[in-house]
Amino acid sequence: MEDTSPQAVAEKAAKDPKAAKDLKDDAAAATKSFPDHFSREGDDQMDFEGVIFSSSPVLDLSQRGLRHLGKFFKIPNLQQLHLQRNLLREIPEDFFQLLPNLTWLDLRYNKIKVLPSGIGSHKHLKTLLLERNPIKMLPVELGQVTTLTALNLRHCPLEFPPRLIVQKGLVAILTFLRICSVEKAFPGDELLPEVSAPKMGSNDLQYPVLPLPRKGSPSENSLNDPDQEKEKADFFPPMERLDLSELRKSNAASEIWPSKEEIRRFWKLRQEIVENEQVEIQEKKLLAVELPPNLKAALNVKEKKHRKPWPAVRKRSTSFKGILPNLPSGYQNTVHANRMEDTHKAALQELQEKETVLEQRRRDKRALQEWREQTQHMRTRRELSKLQPPHSNMMASKIPFATDLTDYEKMPVSPFGKVKPSGEGTAQRPIEISASPLAELEDKIKRHTQQIRTRSFLGTNPMQDIKTANQDLETTKKLQEELRKLKVEMTLNKDHPFPSFTGNLSLHPPASQPQNIFFNTKS
């Protein structure tokens, strides 16, 4: 039976590279699809052990039912490891040392309660996902992972760091863990050696949280008291873990603090941090308002030497700027009112100009319409005047038969003011009456026909042209009707001649001739 232990596989791979390559391919295929017996219920000792040879930088072991992670051998190429939705309860201590190039670790939906402290030595880890794990404390070594850019702690019952720190984000969590790491490296019963503190930037003090001071202030004479030394140790900024095995302990207080200026600077920075924290949490007071008595006594001597007199400052009058609302000045009100008035005037002027233009357009349109109507009316009157016969002829044509046409202006007048009838006119006028209507009617028809032929329709006003054509048609119909009636009358006159229209002299004596009753002036 072939030996499949890790040592045998490694020796075989060293002797036969081709066989090692086949083994790597088989192992990679095996890791991509693990059998279901890894997730058997009741087998609490089931783990995942063995050598994994894979050229791929990604390994997905999610939803495999894994309960324990055995000894992972070195996989230098692995960068992403997915272990979500398993039954893992713990991570091996040397897990992160065996995966030096790991950048992504997904441990969501497991049962992990503690992370190994070896995570602090990792140099490439960027993303750590711990969602839905019953983890309560993060290791302080996690603060040393400077490459970490994403940390998922959703639905984790964390007690350390506090919830306030977790809510502030990754930077606050790492800073808090670094501070706790420094406190763990320098316990309270030991004295801090003389070490020059590194320079701190504003980013390093972004979200620090400091422990509460202990009750009871130390006495000024007991400089080497353990509580006092621990209080002084709290003032140190976060720093990397230092190798202090070769340094000796010192009982002098001057060795604990590098200089008085640094003490003041550190205390000032901490006071600023505390003030920022007190804005959000008013009920908790993290630091005392004043310096401890021993530090105050050490700084008073130097302050007295370098103290300078304050320059005389003129006392300013009480300002009501914060009490009263910001009211605009009178000048600003005037400028604003003038500006609004100018804007209003400009708008009114523009509106008036528009109204003037519109009114002028309406006037021009009305004048043009009136001119067109007047021109059309004059043209109609001119046409009607051409069609109408003279006034005297019209009156003669409308006089009924048996009516004597007498020119009253030319008739002689008797001395008594009465008109004398002329005998010659009454004898010749019936012949003229019978001939003049037909001639006048023929003249009318000729003039109307000639006018229709000479008229030219320009097409500029179609409605007017149609109206004129209808009038011409009506006039033509009237003339035709008059001609028909005149012909009928002439026919009747030929069949029944009257003595008054013959023009012949009557055989009866003058006394028996019929007289015109309209011109009989005798009584």
From Swiss-Prot:
Residues 12-26, 227-236, 372-385 have a biased composition (Basic and acidic residues). Keywords: Coiled coil, Leucine-rich repeat, Repeat. Residues 335-374, 463-494 form a coiled coil. LRR repeats lie at residues 55-76, 77-98, 101-122, 124-145, 147-168. Residues 1-26, 206-236, 372-394, 503-523 are annotated as: Disordered. Residues 513-523 have a biased composition (Polar residues). This is Leucine-rich repeat-containing protein 27. It comes from Mus musculus (Mouse). The gene is Lrrc27.
